Amino acid sequence: MQDDVYLTVEEIAKQLRVSPDTVRRWIREGRLPALDLIGQYRIRREDYERFLEQRRKGQTD
């Protein structure tokens, strides 16, 4: 678990070209797993990559 890499909401928003509020909404909706560190979310890279794969599958289905 110590080897896990974590991303911020802002980093993900920038990569996906969406607003940080959109990323937070995905987290609240349970679509993107995240740790809540007293109001600041951290997303494991592994969970983010899984989220991206699910989005890709959803776009092609």
Question: Predicted regions: what is each one?
Answer:
Residues 1-2, 19, 34, 45, ...:
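Intrinsically disordered, low-complexity peptide-like regions
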Residues 1-25, 54:
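Polyanion-binding surface elements
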Residues 46-61:
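A short, Lys/Arg-enriched interface patch at domain edges and termini
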Residues 16-41:
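Major-groove DNA-recognition helix of helix-turn-helix-type DNA-binding domains
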Residues 6, 41, 48-51:
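Aromatic side chains
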